[in-house]
């Protein structure tokens, strides 16, 4: 997880927008021109448009003000706080099932690679519990927790 430069907790916001690359450019220019304290940025797309997960390194009150500015952009359909999730792909020689259960994270194995996901602090605790048993790890996050839309 990126470290906070200001000593306050990082605030995660999720922004949904349509309009392709021009809309993305407007969002990025807004982040830059308003000097928003961006600590992390993840972009994804689906059938409904694009989704950006932004980590802001500022107090919660400032994050809400920045969210209001972003929500005012013409291409933005939604913007608001999001619960972060971290993912890790791990190769380990240790048994990972018990530490995963104790840490309270979701895990499964796919082709010899352990896929772990959960709250950033819990993923960190899981990796610490594995200790030197981790042969290789790739970490992604924190990102916004996936949201189920329209049932299913």
Per-region residue spans from a language model:
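Long, contiguous binding/interaction regions
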Residues: 1-10, 19-50, 55, 60-152
């Amino acid at each position: 997880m990126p470290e906070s430069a200001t000593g306050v907790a990082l605030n995660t916001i999720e922004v949904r927008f349509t309009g392709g690359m021009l809309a993305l450019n407007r969002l990025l220019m807004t982040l830059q021109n308003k000097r928003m304290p961006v600590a992390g940025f993840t972009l994804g797309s689906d059938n409904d448009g694009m989704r950006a997960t932004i980590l802001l390194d500022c107090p919660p009150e400032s994050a809400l003000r920045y969210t209001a500015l972003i929500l005012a952009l013409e291409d933005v359909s939604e913007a608001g706080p999001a619960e972060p999730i971290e993912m890790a792909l791990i190769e380990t020689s240790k048994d990972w099932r018990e530490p995963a259960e104790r840490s309270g994270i979701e895990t499964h194995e796919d082709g010899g690679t352990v896929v772990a996901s959960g709250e950033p602090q819990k993923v960190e605790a899981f990796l610490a519990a594995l200790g030197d048993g981790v042969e290789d790890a790739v970490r992604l996050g924190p990102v916004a927790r996936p949201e189920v839309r329209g049932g299913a």
